């Protein structure tokens, strides 16, 4: 046997030098050495010359391994008397001294063996005298044609020394008879990177010859990527590797298929890639989505190469595919291997799961206590099927109506306005679907679960940072009965309530976003949820996001993707408001615009979005001496306790955590003070700012997290500052918890009726009928809105309507009609009302100022409007109702409304917007679903100060030196 060693090099250096030295030490020397300079860089050429090969060939650029070996094989003159063998080596293939001797011996013993392969050791972890790590030792195929390494990353303890016949071996160190190489045509040029050796070995087996592994032969490899895929570390390289592997798999599937199967496979390439795309998202591998499509398209357009490969395989095959069944893996074996691999990876990456001690540590009792508080505070609402008051309206009159308002279309409340819906409309539609039989009932549920659910989020969030049960209880109570939440509940602010509930869960998911695609996607969904409920928080949260991206270190794609769902949801509204030159309107609160009294900035900074220091000034006003100063001192002391605990956190063993929390608190305060002084929307003619409570919810949560760090300073004695902190929170909450009993809350049980019963009854039979709602304004004007059917709802509210100050042609016409109705000198408007499908005119009570007072101008305007309506001969008086004075327009044909607002005018933009948003949200939800998929890699760095030791929601000693047993 004459052995021709073919050494292929792409770069010089230590690896190539080691390989050349190893060749010189072989106990069975090579007969001919041919070096191939495969587009090398650096000193490779001179190193190859120093090896004194028989020939040095240059490819002129990087070419596939098979082509480089072919070039070298053609140089060798075939001998009729000597059996030539080709030994394929790369620059990083350092064979052990006896490797070639054992490989040649295997070929000499078995004349039917054409290809033999060695064990491939990991050169980086190998130490002389110690067992090596087997990177590869034989290959096989699954029933579906996937490449399965028989041995991969296992310590060599002799457990595979009896292996012999296999389906295939890797190219690294492969020894192949030159005659077989020439007859079979070498490696398939259609597989330039992956599975070239496997495909060649399959053709060897189908030609009737054998492929064997030689356990005694060992070849080292550094993973340079010359004879196999390179060792990858970066995510970009992993994506490229997956694309190459997937392409090779699909290519071989097309080549190996029989009869009409190739046509069916070709037709299904792209559709199946789309299906697998969703599977990759569900498996938390979004980086592989592009590789799925790219691989499928590449194979779909490689029909010429596939045809040549199939023809060659037909000409070379001498035995049936069934003859390979003994060396292919059965489906049960494939499943067993994958199960073991996943379990090993899970233990390696995640470690042992630890309990949260949710029940043993008092977490359950804390949530039960908050639930009792919630039930007691909201007792007047027990039994309600809907609630009303403040910014509360029915969530929607029907689930179908709510979903019809999502995305883009005609905006209710205005005449002839087409535009994008607020993202909050989608939130309401999703929530309303939970109580589909009565969508508004979900608001009652939200009101009752707000306190315990936000407290649970804070408990879980704090559990990421400390094992101290009392600190977790402090955080849960502080967030659960926060002044901002209690005020939002009593003032009827659904967006603010939902924001307060979601914020702890947002930061909880955000802490794990760098480690898990599932957590990243959950963070993205919660980010979109919070910004949809409170757009005014978007700037602050974006600052937090940018800081996270900058601090997280090497691996940032998971953080970079967080704002994408929110951007998709807000995109149409952003473009519309920018086109109207009204960018600040993007920060307006969704839902009905409700004016509220101006709150002094110092009270906002103390954490109260409404005047009165959370009810303490009201409490002091009933005292004999009106102790306002004493009330202020009590509130200042209570807030001061939490602030002092937060400041102490700056001097704890983990000051960075407190520093970051206090920075977030400042962002929340700046947001709260800023939005309370800028008028974004209009309540009638009254400019109205966004509610400052959402910013204060963010500030309060951050302050509580900083305070938990301060409490932990005393370690096992932390129960004392925690109890003081809880007492301070209770002091702040006491007056607010009584608001539902003493008449300070505007939220009351509702009946889902917005309009008078007479109008609602008519609208139930004729949903297209319209109602003009007139309201006298504090400045003496009269506002008019055009409502359809049963009246406005939370879902039908639109910031595009409430923030628009310019009039469209249709709105100008409607304004003229409304002006004539409230003017005694105007026309009766009978024809115009009929043309618009208006069946009712409702004059509501005059609009009060933010102080709650009704101006003289508003009363005069109301009197003038009612006089004009009474005097209008085209209207029939219905009378006084619970909503105001009502008139009826007789003989109205409401079918004209469908012609005034044809759905066709909203297409195709509506379909495009809804489809895009649905696709992005669907993919994000797939990523967020907890399927148990393992992360491909972990980031090198965490956000400073927010370190944690476990992947799952486990108690973590992140307090530095807090090593004793968890205790209260």
Per-range role (PLM):
Residues 21-30:
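Short, acidic, metal-binding catalytic loop of nucleotide-sugar glycosyltransferases
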Residues 97-141:
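Conserved donor NDP-sugar-binding/catalytic core segment of glycosyltransferases
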Residues 206-301:
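Active-site-adjacent helix/loop segment of glycosyltransferases
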Residues 218, 451-464, 470-553, 558-576, ...:
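Membrane-embedded helix bundles of polyisoprenyl
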Residues 379-504, 509:
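Active-site lumenal/periplasmic loops and adjacent helix-entry segments of GT-C-fold
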Residues 389-398, 412, 416, 485-497, ...:
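Membrane-helix boundary/interfacial segments in multi-pass membrane proteins
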Residues 408-411, 563, 567-653, 753-754, ...:
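Periplasmic/ER-lumenal interhelical loops and adjacent helix-loop junctions
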Residues 591, 731-968:
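Extracytoplasmic
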């Amino acid at each position: 046997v004459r052995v021709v060693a073919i050494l292929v090099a792409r770069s010089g250096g230590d690896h190539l030098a080691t390989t050349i030295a190893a060749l010189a030490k072989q106990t069975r020397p090579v007969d001919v050495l041919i070096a191939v300079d495969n587009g090398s860089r650096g000193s490779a050429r001179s190193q190859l010359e120093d090896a004194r090969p028989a020939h040095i060939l240059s490819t002129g650029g990087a070419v596939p391994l098979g082509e480089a070996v072919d070039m070298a094989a053609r140089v060798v003159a075939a001998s009729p008397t000597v059996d030539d063998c080709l030994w394929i080596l790369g620059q990083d293939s350092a064979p052990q001294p006896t490797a070639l001797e054992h490989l040649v011996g295997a070929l000499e013993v078995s004349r039917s063996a054409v290809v033999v392969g060695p064990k491939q050791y990991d050169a980086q972890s190998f130490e002389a005298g110690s067992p090596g790590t087997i990177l590869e030792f034989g290959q096989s195929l699954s029933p579906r044609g996937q490449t399965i390494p028989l041995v991969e990353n296992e310590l060599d303890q002799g457990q595979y020394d009896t292996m012999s016949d296999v389906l295939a071996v890797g190219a690294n160190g492969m020894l192949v008879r030159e005659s077989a190489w020439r007859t079979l045509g070498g490696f398939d040029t259609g597989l330039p990177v992956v599975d070239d050796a496997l495909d060649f070995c399959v053709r060897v087996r189908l030609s009737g010859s054998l492929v064997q592994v030689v356990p005694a032969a060992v070849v080292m490899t550094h993973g340079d990527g010359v004879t196999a895929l390179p060792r990858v570390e970066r995510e970009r390289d992993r994506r490229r590797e997956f694309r190459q592997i997937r392409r090779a798999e699909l290519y071989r599937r097309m080549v190996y298929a029989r009869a009409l199967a190739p046509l069916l496979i070709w037709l299904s390439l792209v559709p199946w890639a789309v299906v697998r795309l969703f599977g990759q998202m569900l498996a938390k591998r979004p980086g592989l989505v592009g590789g799925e499509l790219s691989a499928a398209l590449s194979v779909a357009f490689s029909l010429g190469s596939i045809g040549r490969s199939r023809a060659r395989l037909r000409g070379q095959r001498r035995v049936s595919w069934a003859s390979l069944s003994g060396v292919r893996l059965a489906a049960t074996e494939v499943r067993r291997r994958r199960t073991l691999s996943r379990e090993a990876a899970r233990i390696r990456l995640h470690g042992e799961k630890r309990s949260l001690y949710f029940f043993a540590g008092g977490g359950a009792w804390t949530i039960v206590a908050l639930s009792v508080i919630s039930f007691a505070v909201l007792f007047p609402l027990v039994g309600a099927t809907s609630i009303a008051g403040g910014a509360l309206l029915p969530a929607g009159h029907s689930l179908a109506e709510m979903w019809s308002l999502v995305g883009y279309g005609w905006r209710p409340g205005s005449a002839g306005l087409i535009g994008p819906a607020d993202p909050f409309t989608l939130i309401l539609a999703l929530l309303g679907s939970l109580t589909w039989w009565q969508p508004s009932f979900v608001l009652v549920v939200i009101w009752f679960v707000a306190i315990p659910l936000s407290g649970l989020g804070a408990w879980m969030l704090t559990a990421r940072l400390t094992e101290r049960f009392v600190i977790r209880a402090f955080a849960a109570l502080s967030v659960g009965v926060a002044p901002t939440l209690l005020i939002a509940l009593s003032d009827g602010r659904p967006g603010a309530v939902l924001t307060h509930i979601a914020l702890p869960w947002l930061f909880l998911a955000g802490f794990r976003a760098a480690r898990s695609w599932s957590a990243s996607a959950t963070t993205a969904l919660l980010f979109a949820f919070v910004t949809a409920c409170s757009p005014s928080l978007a700037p602050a949260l974006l600052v937090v996001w940018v800081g996270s991206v900058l601090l997280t270190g090497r691996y940032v794609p998971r953080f970079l993707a967080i704002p994408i769902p929110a951007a998709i949801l807000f995109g149409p509204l952003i473009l519309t408001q920018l086109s109207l030159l009204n960018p600040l309107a993007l920060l307006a609160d969704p839902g009905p615009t409700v004016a509220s009294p101006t709150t002094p900035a110092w009270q906002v900074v103390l954490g109260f979005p409404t005047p009165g220091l959370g009810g303490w000034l009201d409490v002091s006003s009933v005292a004999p001496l009106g102790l306002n100063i004493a009330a202020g001192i009590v509130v200042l002391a209570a807030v001061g306790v939490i602030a002092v605990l937060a400041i102490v956190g700056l001097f704890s063993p983990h000051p960075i955590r407190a520093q970051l929390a206090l920075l977030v608190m400042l962002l929340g305060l700046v947001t709260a003070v800023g939005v309370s002084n800028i008028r974004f929307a209009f309540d009638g003619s009254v400019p109205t700012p966004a509610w400052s409570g959402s910013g204060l919810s963010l500030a309060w949560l951050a302050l509580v997290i900083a305070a938990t760090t301060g409490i932990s300073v005393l370690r096992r004695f932390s129960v004392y500052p925690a109890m003081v902190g809880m007492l301070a929170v209770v002091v702040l909450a006491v007056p607010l918890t009584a608001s539902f009993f003493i008449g300070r809350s505007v939220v009351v049980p509702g009946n889902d009726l917005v309009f008078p019963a007479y109008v609602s009854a008519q609208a139930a039979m004729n949903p297209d009928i319209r109602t003009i709602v007139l309201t006298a304004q504090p400045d003496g004007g009269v506002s008019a809105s055009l409502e359809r059917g049963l009246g406005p709802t939370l879902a039908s509210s639109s910031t595009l309507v409430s923030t628009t100050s310019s009039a469209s042609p249709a709105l100008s016409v409607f304004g003229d009609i409304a002006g004539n109705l409230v003017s005694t000198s105007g026309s009766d408007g009978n024809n115009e009302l009929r043309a618009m499908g208006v069946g009712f005119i409702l004059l509501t009570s005059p609009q009060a100022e933010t102080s709650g007072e009704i101006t003289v101008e508003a009363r005069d305007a109301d009197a003038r409007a009612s006089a004009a309506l009474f005097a209008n001969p085209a209207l029939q008086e219905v009378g006084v109702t619970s909503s105001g004075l009502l008139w009826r327009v007789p003989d109205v044909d409401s079918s004209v409304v469908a012609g005034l607002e044809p759905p066709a005018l909203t297409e195709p933009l509506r379909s495009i917007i809804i489809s895009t948003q649905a696709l992005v949200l669907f993919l994000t939800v797939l990523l967020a679903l907890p399927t148990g998929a393992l992360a491909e890699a972990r980031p090198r760095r965490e956000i400073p100060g927010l370190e944690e030791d476990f992947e799952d929601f486990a108690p973590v000693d992140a307090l530095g030196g807090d090593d004793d047993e968890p205790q209260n």
